Amino acid sequence: MVSESHHEALAAPPATTVAAAPPSNVTEPASPGGGGGKEDAFSKLKEKFMNELNKIPLPPWALIAIAIVAVLLILTCCFCLCKKCLFKKKNKKKGKEKGGKNAINMKDVKDLGKTMKDQDDDAETGLTDGEEKEEPKEVEKLGKIQYSLDYDFQNNQLLVGIIQAAELPALDMGGTSDPYVKVFLLPDKKKKYETKVHRKTLNPVFNEQFTFKVPYSELGGKTLVMAVYDFDRFSKHDIIGEYKVAMNTVDFGHVTEEWRDLQSAEKEEQEKLGDICFSLRYVPTAGKLTVVILEAKNLKKMDVGGLSDPYVKIHLMQNGKRLKKKKTTIKKNTLNPYYNESFSFEVPFEQIQKVQIVVTVLDYDKIGKNDAIGKVFVGYNSTGAELRHWSDMLANPRRPIAQWHTLQPEEEVDAMLAVKK
């Protein structure tokens, strides 16, 4: 008995611990009861908000739209503020890391490299003084020319030999040029020589000699110019480069022969030779082409007195051959002659598209050769204003079509006619 009671007494403590457990379990479900109170409060607040919302005299869709717009505006403002703050932080960080390098660059742009800071900035960016100077110094190589000079004391003649040119730049689409050389003595530009055109080459060999009749006593005040051009059949010829020789620096005790680098030519204005006005009329049924030389103006002064004695030659040409030739009367001592002289040529209709009319204004000289002031041609393979004039004539048969034309240098027109055969 004693042992049984003793066992019951020992079992009592565990019983008390088991009985204590339920209260701890009872406290846990109490929290949901507290959450339910919060939900009731939220539902009451929601109900109150909806009641107030219902009092507003607007349909539900309008309220929803207003709410969406308001939310979008708030989000946009927040995004802009965040972006602005981040941008400021980045700029400050860059300024600290680079030590104001950008500020120096701006100053470099404004001051164009006048201070030591600009030089330091160049060093930072990897540019050196040599590299800076190389940009404007990118001088294009223009090639070189070989020539010879001699003087014939018995005949008072300067002998200029154009031997060859080399390493010329390519000015044509095919990677070549069509070079030729103009030779003249300054200050007198009236007498000019030129070599033959050499096709599609950058190393032309000319081997041509030209003679200038100049007394030795006057030679020292003159300058020889050798200008290399690229021939262009459709437009003005491009100058490649030139070389000038002052005659007072040449020793004419022996023949001079040397290579010299071509230099960039000064852009000289096209010498104004004057303008000429003439009319064209074609009658297809009769095969008759009529050219009326009306007048010329602002002609180049050719005589010592500052005037000229101009007259006009008209050539009918086909395939480089002169078929017919006409000329006007000579007008004395004038740079603005008036002619109004008519000339007719027989040209069958099937040939009218193949012929050319070449108009040349010349200065009459009693002694010596008559010098050409300038010329122009219309018809087959003409371009620009000359082509328009010819086209207008063909488009208006039996009607005279008058037009002004600018005179061009004789050598340029002759070169174009030589190609356009």
Curated annotation (Swiss-Prot):
Cytoplasmic compartment residues: 82-421
Biased composition (Acidic residues): 119-133
Compositionally biased intervals (Low complexity): 10-23
Alphabetized SUPFAM superfamilies for the sequence: C2 domain (Calcium/lipid-binding domain, CaLB) (SSF49562)
Binding site for Ca(2+) 1: D172, D178, D230, F231, D232
Binding site for Ca(2+) 3: D232, S235, K236, D238
Keywords: Calcium, Cytoplasm, Cytoplasmic vesicle, Differentiation, Glycoprotein, Lipoprotein, Membrane, Metal-binding, Palmitate, Repeat, Synapse, Transmembrane, Transmembrane helix
Domain C2: 141-260, 272-405
Pfam family, one: C2
Segments for region (Disordered): 1-40, 94-139
Compositionally biased tracts (Basic and acidic residues): 107-118
Subcellular location: Cytoplasmic vesicle, Secretory vesicle membrane; Cytoplasmic vesicle, Secretory vesicle, Synaptic vesicle membrane; Cytoplasmic vesicle, Secretory vesicle, Chromaffin granule membrane; Cytoplasm
Names of required cofactors: Ca(2+)
GO biological process: calcium ion-regulated exocytosis of neurotransmitter; cell differentiation; positive regulation of dendrite extension; regulation of calcium ion-dependent exocytosis; regulation of hormone secretion; regulation of regulated secretory pathway; response to calcium ion; synaptic vesicle endocytosis
Residues with glycosylation annotation: N25
Residue numbers binding Ca(2+) 4: D303, D309, D363, D365
Topology of this chain in the membrane: Single-pass membrane protein
Region (Phospholipid binding) residue spans: 135-381
GO molecular function: calcium ion binding; calcium-dependent phospholipid binding; clathrin binding; phosphatidylserine binding; phospholipid binding; SNARE binding
Organism domain of life: Eukaryota
Family: Belongs to the synaptotagmin family.
Domain remarks: The first C2 domain mediates Ca(2+)-dependent phospholipid binding. The second C2 domain mediates interaction with SV2A and probably with STN2.
Alphabetized PANTHER family for the sequence: SYNAPTOTAGMIN, SYNAPTOTAGMIN-1
Name of the protein: Synaptotagmin-1
Organism: Anser cygnoides (Swan goose)
Lineage: Eukaryota, Metazoa, Chordata, Craniata, Vertebrata
